[in-house]
């Protein structure tokens, strides 16, 4: 870690900040069985990827894209957006210590508007919120996390990524940023080799632990 330079915490959203991945698994699992029965565990295959990438890759037909998007937006309107245990307090602790916080989500602005309605405090919790519209490539490409670090001209060794999905973990590691796997969506065993450190949730994590890992 380089002293006297910004420290940045880069958070994926679903499954890291918000406890929503199990709900998305239900939706995308049903979509996969309906439209792509030849792809087992479709919900796991697409986790962490932007909606645009998912549509272009698996639903090239424009009419089918509209149908899937309509079903998704209706589903998101009725989702519950609870916080992952401990994450709210952890983010507040980071702010108290001057750590820059960035949401790096594959979700689009339409989905995030549902989050803001459910949590009016969400926007002011973070220094920046990056959505799929900000990225030129979907996870597992590292572009999104490199962009998050660049916003504050932070050295990569001063940054930490928090991710739950395989694609997100690959993006963090490909960016050459210390990557913490959050075992909410996938088991500890399955993400251990893809992470630099693994936590179950944020009740067991703190600013001091983050600094210890970055030093």
What spans do the regions from the language model cover?
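Asp-based, Mg2+/Mn2+-dependent phosphohydrolase catalytic module
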Residues: 1-7, 92, 108-110, 114-215
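N-terminal helical cap/lid subdomain that shapes the substrate entry/recognition surface
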Residues: 2-97
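Conserved SAM-binding loop
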Residues: 17, 83, 101-104, 137, ...
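Small/polar loops that bind or transfer phosphate-bearing groups
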Residues: 19-20, 47, 103-104, 163, ...
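Non-catalytic, surface-exposed connector residues within folded enzymatic/regulatory domains
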Residues: 45, 66, 81-84, 106, ...
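Short phosphate-binding/catalytic loops that engage adenosine nucleotides
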Residues: 97-99, 177
